[in-house]
């Protein structure tokens, strides 16, 4: 796969512009499972969530951003390198995915469908919003579509090109290391290839490359954790055997069909369903259906779990668009496509620049305000980025945790409440039990889990209650708009910073 010089720089410039202007928050894993471990690894401070203490996560994905931090530190780029370095790298990954899906569609479906695929990809609101974020799913998407460019699909005639096949296997194995569930699509494609080719060589090569990549990853993880541990095994045990992923939410079985796909595809969703129906006999379409079906059997579901398939979904949408009679007339074609694409613009811009921006803005405020000595977040857990954005080794910071239950009976699991739950069940009781008196003697502090910090951060939904509880001990010193509406009542309103008054 050779880069088209005019196209790739344009795509990179486009994704860079999005990455550097995105100011909002989507889901915690963008920070807490990627940038925070990387920041802690390089700078030696921060917070590692329970997954890292239990060895559920491979350091492979955070290591990518740790390299960015190391280079930034070497070049003395300061805060700018810490904040913008990962964004630049992720924009490169996103642009590579854009270019790769274009070349893949061109290779297998022709110029018209490849152009329509590229249109869907660059105008997708969800792609605009998520592809430049540092989720492992985002890099998984890039690796998947890059690997497919080298994979021998059912339209490939003759013998398998073993060099291309080897490249595909390496990329696929790395994707599976980053996200173990990526093995679903590759297992389907692999079995289909074996059935079609009936070659022992392709099986042994897959086994050899898979073993090498897994062994290297195991070595890196052992060096990181300083103990013999296998995150892939721990991950599967937690999510499948113990089924504790359901602690983070349970969705109905049709979630991916009726909720996730419309979120991913927005205006392109009817064309996707039509296109995948047209292509239902192809291995790629069947692989996508298989992956969505298996994911639907797992109780905990999230839209970003199938996000890596979005480039492929755009191909199926393009296949449908290509069949529309209205597109046979040039003037109507471009008018229709332009209107269709423009429908995504308001959603993409609002999600990237406005909705949930306060929780990111407040970390910039903390980073750039030297007078802040300590800060506490009375919010649902992981509501903001952490030291990857605050980058302050000189302050004491805490937040309410939400670690899942481990080693409890089924009856205990049903009634388990994490720390954040306990706080929101009865905020005043929690504050009395875990904090000293607001204006109390400092000798009392040791008896309590928390001390009152120099600054408190809350959502507007809690503002009235907190003001009533702390009285004149704290005053509002900064406010950041966060959202117009929010599905979680605990997160509604502005992000408000309270400053402690001197005694």
Regions of interest found by a model, annotated:
Residues 33-41, 53-77, 92, 138, ...:
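Short hydrophobic/aromatic helix or loop-helix immediately within or flanking a transmembrane segment
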Residues 149-172, 181-214, 315, 327:
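Perimembrane helix-loop-helix junctions
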Residues 27-29, 126-139, 303-306:
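Short acidic/glycine- and proline-prone juxtamembrane loop motifs at membrane-interface regions
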Residues 84-109:
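Transmembrane-helix motifs of polytopic, lipid-linked glycan transferases
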Residues 8-12, 211, 215, 282-289, ...:
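Signature aromatic-anchored transmembrane alpha helix within multi-pass, membrane-resident enzymes
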Residues 193, 258-285, 292-295:
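Hydrophobic, aromatic-rich transmembrane alpha-helices
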Residues 16, 20, 117-119, 125-131, ...:
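Membrane-interface alpha helices of multi-pass inner-membrane proteins
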Residues 330-455, 460-461, 481, 492-496:
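Membrane-embedded, lumen/periplasm-facing catalytic core of multi-pass transferases
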């Amino acid at each position: 796969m050779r880069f088209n010089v005019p196209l790739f720089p344009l795509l990179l410039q486009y994704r860079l512009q999005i990455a550097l202007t995105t100011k909002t928050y989507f889901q915690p894993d963008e920070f807490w499972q990627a940038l925070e471990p990387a920041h802690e690894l390089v700078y030696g401070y921060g917070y590692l969530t329970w997954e890292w203490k239990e060895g559920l996560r491979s350091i492979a994905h955070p290591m990518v951003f740790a390299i960015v931090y190391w280079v930034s530190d070497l070049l003395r780029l300061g805060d700018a390198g810490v904040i913008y370095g990962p964004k630049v790298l992720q924009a490169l990954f996103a642009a590579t995915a854009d270019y790769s899906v274009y070349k893949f569609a061109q290779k297998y479906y022709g110029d018209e469908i490849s152009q329509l695929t590229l249109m869907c990809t660059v105008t997708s609101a969800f792609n605009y919003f998520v592809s430049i974020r540092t989720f492992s799913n985002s890099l998984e998407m890039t690796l998947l579509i890059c690997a497919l460019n080298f994979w021998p699909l059912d339209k490939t005639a003759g013998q398998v090109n073993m060099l291309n096949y080897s490249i595909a296997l390496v990329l696929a194995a790395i994707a599976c290391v980053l996200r173990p569930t990526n093995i679903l699509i590759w297992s389907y494609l692999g079995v289909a290839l074996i059935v079609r080719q009936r070659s022992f060589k392709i099986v042994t090569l897959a086994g050899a490359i898979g073993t090498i990549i897994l062994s290297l990853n195991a070595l890196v993880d052992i060096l990181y954790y300083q103990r013999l541990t296998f995150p892939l095994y721990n991950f599967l045990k937690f999510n499948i055997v113990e089924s504790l992923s359901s602690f983070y939410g349970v969705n109905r079985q049709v979630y991916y069909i009726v909720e996730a796909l419309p979120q991913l595809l927005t205006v392109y969703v009817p064309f996707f369903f039509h296109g995948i129906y047209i292509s239902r006999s192809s291995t790629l379409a069947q692989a996508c259906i298989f992956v969505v079906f298996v994911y639907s059997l797992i109780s905990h579901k999230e839209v970003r779990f199938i996000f890596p398939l979005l480039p492929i979904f755009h191909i199926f949408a393009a296949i449908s668009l290509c069949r529309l009679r209205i597109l046979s007339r040039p003037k109507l074609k471009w008018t229709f496509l332009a209107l269709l694409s423009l429908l995504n613009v308001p959603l993409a811009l609002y999600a990237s620049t406005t909705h949930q921006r306060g929780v990111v803005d407040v970390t910039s405020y903390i980073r750039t305000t030297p007078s802040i000595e300590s800060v506490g977040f009375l919010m649902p857990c992981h509501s903001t980025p952490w030291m990857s954005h605050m980058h302050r080794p000189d302050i004491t910071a805490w937040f309410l945790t939400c670690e899942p239950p481990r080693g409890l009976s089924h009856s205990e699991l049903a009634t388990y409440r994490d720390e954040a739950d306990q706080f929101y069940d009865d905020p005043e009781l929690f504050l009395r039990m875990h904090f000293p008196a607001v204006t109390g003697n400092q000798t009392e502090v040791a008896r309590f889990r928390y001390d009152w910090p120099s600054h408190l951060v809350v959502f507007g939904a809690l503002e009235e209650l907190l003001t009533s509880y702390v009285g004149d001990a704290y005053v509002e010193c900064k406010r950041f708009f966060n959202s117009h509406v929010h599905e979680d009542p605990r997160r509604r309103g502005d992000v408000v910073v309270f400053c402690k008054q001197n005694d």
